[in-house]
């Protein structure tokens, strides 16, 4: 009996220690990496300025506004739609901290889905964060999830019905921001975020919207621009200019029958020219090996080298991988 009590006390103590350590790690996911306002940022807004119901939630993301001295066109750049696609988020951070606008206005939302920044996809063994060395020291960044945190929106339905079109998708797509547009003011958390972004475009009459993404190397639409039909002429020009610089990039039309995505709904429901950009990210692929900080930053994975040799990929892939510098560079060039 005495041994059983001692064993029980030890097990309870160990359980508390494990719970404390795990809880501490989970609490870290609520911490946001710092974004330094560059000299080009002239003002800031919140998504709650366009939908007050988001105030005080993780969906009340910052909107950085960079306005030039001369009037001109306007563009919205979205990062963090899927926070497990780090090149998209890093591109917007670079723009916020370094871009200066002479003419027109640039709107930037680095954390389009702030809730998805606060957790990882379950059973994927993804890192919570990754670190980049800079001349000013190390900087860390969150590695999040493709979907809204269940703490903010739960449970998932068996079937997700897109409100504007009636299209039916898998139930977990209800937490995918890029299946929620144009959104609803009285909808789910994810639909409210989509609605606020749509209202931002409408009320400011933003001319162009660029949604930054990444895709796994085995995904057909990769290293490409996906454009609404009204945005095809300008997107074609961008593709030609990038090809002239020896940057291979494809151009895909937005499927009219696939609803909820930025390049479809924002083009249909607003006057903006809606486009989406994809780069190659091995850390979110299904064929990857160990998912760690090194894979996120270097894009090197021997499994994908083998997959390339047997023709299973839609992007060139060798021992050099596709590092974060290349992926961010593609977004910035586009």
What are these regions (language model features)?
Residues 67-74:
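Proline/glycine-enriched tight loop/beta-turn segments at coil->beta junctions
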Residues 81-83, 183, 281-285:
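A generic structural motif
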Residues 2-65, 98, 102, 189-208, ...:
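C-terminal accessory segments enriched in acidic
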Residues 69, 112-114, 280-282:
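Short, solvent-exposed coil/turn elements at secondary-structure transition points
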Residues 86-87, 102-240:
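Active-site/substrate-binding loop(s) of hydrolase catalytic cores
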Residues 82-90:
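Di-metal (Zn2+ and/or Mg2+/Mn2+) metal-binding site signature of metallo-dependent hydrolases
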Residues 76-79:
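Short hydrophobic beta-strand that contains or immediately precedes a catalytic carboxylate
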Residues 92-97:
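Histidine-anchored nucleotide/phosphate-binding helix
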